Structures are given as structure tokens and as C-alpha cells.
């Protein structure tokens, strides 16, 4: 029995996730925005050319591993690396979801070993697996999103967890960039703050 079957919610049937375009439909109607898109809209979109300009204008450029590469080659390498990381992150998410829903998982990656260490800690804390990849929504604000993992705490509350497969989680942004909208203008444009806002 899956966790969704074990712990159903009355609103589960009202929402549908569309992987293409990363959109949601609530009661058959597309929501205005996903939580992920809402957070991204508060910050400047990544501009590879601007970043490359900055790298090439540094005094230390000749020592960079990208030195001697064309702009196109640098961007192609970044794109390939990003696609690979995304695929591996998706696989890890899927394997964790399968694990908590009682399916057999074969994954010998170091990241999955980290997860199994977390699993030991989770049991020690008395956290009970409650839901995986739980799609939720807020009708008044036309928002929707997917919660990676929910656990029930010993005191009966629900704790939200978010799986991340990244090289580093940084509080300080590249170039000390800040958010571009009033609500986030005092928040650094770094993955730590992006992830925190998604969970808020």
C-alpha cells in the first residue's frame, strides 16, 4: 500500500501535475503559477553570457579551467552538466519515493548512501513516513506545488522535507546579487534562500 493510499487527503483528487511545462491543474483549471516558478520570478534569471563576461574580465582568467574555450563551448559544457545533474536528481527523488512506498530500490550511488544515513536518523527521531511527492494547492492565491516528503512527528504534527542533490548549498550569492522584487529585495540570490522560500 502506498503512503497516498494509507494517508489520503480529501483534496488529492482535485489536483493534477503536468510534467511538461511543470504546471498544475486544480479541478481541471490550470493554476496561475507553481511555487517553484513564483520563487524564480523573484530573482534574476541566469544569464550565461553575463557570467562568462565576468569570468573573462577577471585578472585570474588565464588560470580558469575554462580558459581557451569559446563561449559556445563553455555554455555547451554547462548545459550538459546541468542536464546530467537534473537527471540524476530526478532518479534520486524517484528512488526515495519508491523506498518509502515499499518498492525495491537498486541504487549504489553515494547520494543514496547519504539518504540511508538519513533514514537511520529518521528512525531514531521517531518520524513516521506520511506522504511522498504530495501535490498541494492554494485556491485563493492560485498556487500549487509538490512536497518531496512529509513525516509525522511524535507529537502528531506534519514535518516537510525537501530532497536536494547539489554540490553545495550557499547562503551568499554570486556577486552578492539580491532579489529583484520588493518582497525579496533583502534576500540573497542563492540556492539556500531559493530552497527556503519554496518551503516557507
Language model region names:
Residues 4-10, 74-186, 193, 197:
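Catalytic cores of nuclease domains that cleave nucleic-acid phosphodiester backbones
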Residues 200:
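Substrate-binding/gating loop at the entrance of the active-site cleft, primarily
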Residues 1-91, 184:
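Charged, glycine-rich intrinsically disordered N-terminal tails and low-complexity linkers that flank
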